């Protein structure tokens, strides 16, 4: 019985750790040298614009602003919002609810 409980605890911790790792995953690290705004600053700006929990984050080339932006998926009140922050100016470029088929 003790082995079964220990196995359940280890499995739960493993699953939780996997979730935390997924939330902290970052795409676009190769573009960081081109940005003037750090990931931490961009995260703070995104959360100030739309408080919640960041579930996905990336740095990408995209039209609008200077062409380089951090994109954050933020879970809030049961919905997912996409918040874009210009990676060179720090300006919030986008703050909208995602549709039924998010990126």
Where are these regions (language model features)?
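Long, terminal "pre-/pro-" and other extracytoplasmic accessory regions
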Residues: 2-103
């Amino acid at each position: 019985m003790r082995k079964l409980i220990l196995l359940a605890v280890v499995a739960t911790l493993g699953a939780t750790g996997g979730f935390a790792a997924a939330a902290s995953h970052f795409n676009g690290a190769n573009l960081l040298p081109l940005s003037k705004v750090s990931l931490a600053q961009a995260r703070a700006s995104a959360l100030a614009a739309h408080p919640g929990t960041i579930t996905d984050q990336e740095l990408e080339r995209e039209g609008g602003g200077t062409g380089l932006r951090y994109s954050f998926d933020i879970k809030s009140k049961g919905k997912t919002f996409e918040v874009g922050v210009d990676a060179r100016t720090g300006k919030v470029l986008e703050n909208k609810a995602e549709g039924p088929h998010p990126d």
